[in-house]
Curated annotation (Swiss-Prot):
This protein's name: UPF0102 protein Plav_3586
NCBIfam families recorded: PRK12497.1-5
InterPro entries: Restrct_endonuc-II-like, tRNA_endonuc-like_dom_sf, UPF0102_YraN-like
Taxonomic path: Bacteria, Pseudomonadati, Pseudomonadota, Alphaproteobacteria, Hyphomicrobiales
Pfam families: UPF0102 (PF02021)
Signal peptide from the UniProt entry: none
Domain of life: Bacteria
Family in the record: Belongs to the UPF0102 family.
PANTHER family associated with the record: UPF0102 PROTEIN YRAN
One Gene Ontology MF term: nucleic acid binding
């Protein structure tokens, strides 16, 4: 039996229950990240933006800053902080290039890459300007 097209990628690879749980965890983590960023004065430009290079979790803006945000949810703080590998950073950089190509009015803004770490029983951590390409 073929998995549904809307099923999360993890569900298509293996156990559907595990994949669905991971998908829901990701949605909850992104919702918490949106709340945190709104409280800090950011405006959400896009959520789960799909580009040929990959998906961007959040695109937010505050003033002249445009941030491509990767949301990481893990069971422990250190695991969340270490979850963004250099390969994923390059993928996000390519996705951001597609974003700027598709929406040229963003090209005048200061682009940066942020990470929001979501860990159970702790406040979410926003790492502004987490890395530079």
């Amino acid at each position: 039996m073929k998995p549904a097209r809307f099923a999360p990628r993890a569900a298509r690879k293996g156990n559907p229950a595990t994949g669905l749980a991971a998908y829901r965890l990701g949605l909850r983590a992104e919702t918490l990240a949106v709340l945190l960023l709104r409280l800090k004065g950011y405006r959400v430009v896009a959520r789960r933006l799909k580009t040929p290079a990959g998906e961007i979790d959040l695109v937010v803006r505050r003033g002249r800053a445009l941030a491509v945000v990767e949301v990481k949810a893990r069971g422990e703080g250190d695991a969340a902080a270490e979850a963004l590998l250099p390969r994923q950073q390059r993928r996000l950089e390519r996705a951001a290039a597609h974003l700027l190509g598709r929406y040229p009015h963003f090209a005048d803004l200061d682009l940066r890459f942020d990470v929001v770490l979501i860990v159970p029983r702790r406040w979410p951590r926003h790492l502004a300007d987490a890395w530079r390409p």
